């Protein structure tokens, strides 16, 4: 298959990224599915993986990417076959530690927190495997729009709902409204009935 492969770490990431041949993922194990990628989205995490993440040892070459939309074309043994043919998006967090307190989100720097596209090969490829528990059916949504949903909205949701427990009428200050997480936060604030206030260097 074809994949966007990061050959090595370096300060100028694009010089070390190329479209290249890569082995297809193996047959999915129990509880997993293989996804044929329709669209994958860039995230700032891709730059961190390309430049190197302090304290995290990564092997290269590797495939980046944590956000994607695709069609399930294979499932593992004893896995619900009704997933086949469904268009899905991905929660890239394949391993999450228990929260210190019930209302706390899992820490993204805990030793057992793992992401496709960071700790494991990612989704900037024609195919990838993922646990079905990490996939969400998204019918009738433009794959290009759906692909960009995952990390940004999950980060914003964890911050607003899991951690801050935002309620209708709460004021929420969002700085740097042009970014992906900030835009996701704005949309979630509206959905939650909160009262967002945004800042930007751009005069609108």
What is each PLM-predicted segment?
Residues 10-19, 44-46:
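Short N-terminal binding/cap micro-motifs at the start of the first secondary-structure element
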Residues 23-41, 53-104, 108:
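Glycine-rich beta-strand-centered segment in the early N-terminal region that forms part
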Residues 96-104, 118-132:
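A structural motif shared across PLP-dependent enzymes of the aminotransferase-like
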Residues 101-117, 194:
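Short, compositionally biased
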Residues 142-204:
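Mid-domain Rossmann-like dinucleotide-binding core that forms the NAD(H)/NADP(H) cofactor-binding site
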């Amino acid at each position: 298959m074809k994949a966007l492969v990061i050959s090595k770490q370096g300060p100028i990431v694009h010089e070390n990224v190329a479209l290249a041949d890569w082995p297809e993922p193996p047959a999915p194990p129990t509880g997993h599915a293989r996804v044929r990628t329709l669209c994958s989205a860039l995230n700032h995490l891709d730059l961190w993986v390309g430049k190197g993440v302090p304290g995290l040892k990564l092997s290269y070459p590797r495939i980046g990417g944590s956000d994607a939309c695709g069609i399930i074309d294979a499932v593992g043994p004893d896995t619900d076959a009704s997933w086949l043919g469904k268009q899905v998006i991905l929660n890239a967090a394949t391993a999450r530690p228990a929260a210190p307190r019930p209302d706390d989100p899992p820490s993204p720097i805990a030793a057992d927190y793992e992401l496709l596209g960071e700790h494991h090969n990612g989704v900037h490829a024609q195919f990838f495997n993922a646990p079905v528990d990490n996939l969400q059916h998204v019918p009738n949504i433009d794959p290009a729009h759906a692909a960009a949903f995952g990390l940004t909205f999950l980060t914003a949701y964890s911050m607003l709902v899991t951690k801050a427990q935002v309620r209708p009428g709460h004021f929420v200050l969002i700085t740097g409204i042009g970014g992906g997480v900030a835009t996701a936060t704005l949309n979630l604030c509206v959905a939650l009935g909160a009262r967002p206030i945004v800042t930007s260097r751009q005069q609108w």
